Structures are given as structure tokens and as C-alpha cells.
Amino acid sequence: MADSVEGSVAKLRFDISMSLDGYVAGPDQSIDEPLGVGGRQLHEWAYGLSTWRASHGQEGGKTGVDNAAVRESLENIGATIMGRGMFGPGHGAWGEEPWEGWWGGEPPFGTPVFVLTHHPRETLVKGKTSFEFVTDGIHPALERASEAAGGADVAQQYLAAGLVDEMQIHLIPVFLGGGARLFDGAGLEGIGLERRRVVDSPTGVVHLHFRTAGERGR
């Protein structure tokens, strides 16, 4: 989930890769398998792209429609919202040596990141990225992200609450057979969507871009 800026208006959009059977992570997520069993397949299409590599401090890489989709995903982002499951493994209290993210000393975000959790924790700064841990719900997290801008359950909550402006789904030609579904549960019925764009890639990935119908209420 990211708060992007267009002109002077902050917009909330989510961008995610999804399997043909609707999963955004494989089963049995763990420290050894942070994306779940088979979940890495959802993101392999992006790893060799020039925009992805540049965001991780690397040179070279491929261009084309997939790269354009990643570039659009990363443009004009002022802040990011994620669930605890995207930040790291486990639940409950953080412990004496709390997890500091999957990304090492230089996370690729370069902007404030707001992590939804039930357990308080001091703000963590890694490189150019700050992680603030929000314990009072999705609306306060959105307010903080919007001010700063000037995972599946999180996307569902914001979408069901009518707070999402746009979404881009990268449909990957694989079946995972289990894991975390993007759209799972009640509360999404009746949400209007306007198709903005559908882009077919030679790699087999289909990039779907939608706007939600109507004005978002804060």
C-alpha cells in the first residue's frame, strides 16, 4: 500500500503481484520462506528489470512493458503502509532482539513506512527508510502516511473501508494452490471499479490497473 502524490492531492493505491488462483503469498510463510512456499514465483518477473535493480542500488537490467509497470509503481510515492506480515515473520510481542525487516541495512523504500501492528515499538530507521509502528488502526495509519506524503489483509481492510483510490495487480501465470489470498472475506461486495488499463507482457504477466469508482472519504 502506498500513498502517492499527484499535484497537491495524496492518493492511496496498492500494487501487488497475484497468482492466477488469487494468492499473493504461498503457504507456510517463515523466516526461511518469507513469501511462503512457491511465493518467490510471484516476483521473479521483476528482479531483472532496470527499475527494480536501480531501486536496490544495482546497475543494468531489462526494459519494456514490465519495467514500465514497476517504474509506475515506484513513482511519486510519499509513504508506504504495510502489515506486520510483510515487515517480518511472527506475531505477538517483539522480544528482546526485534526483527528489523527483510531488506538489510538499505531497504528500497527511501520514504516513511507505517507498519500496522498490535504491539508498540520505537520507530526504526534503516538507511533512508523509517519504519513507524502504528497500533491504533488503519485510519490513523492512513492519516500519518498522507501527512508524510504531502500485504493482503491490509489491502482488504482499506478497500473494504472505501479508502483505496487505485490498484495495480500484476497477474502472474502460476498456481500456488494455497497461502494468503488477496481478496478473501466479506466486505468487498458492491465496490465499483473502473478499468484504467490492461497490459499484456511477452513474459506472460498481465498488468491490471483499476480506479475505484466515486470519491474517497477520509
Predicted regions and their residues:
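Enzymes that bind and transform nitrogen-containing heteroaromatic metabolites
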Residues: 2-218
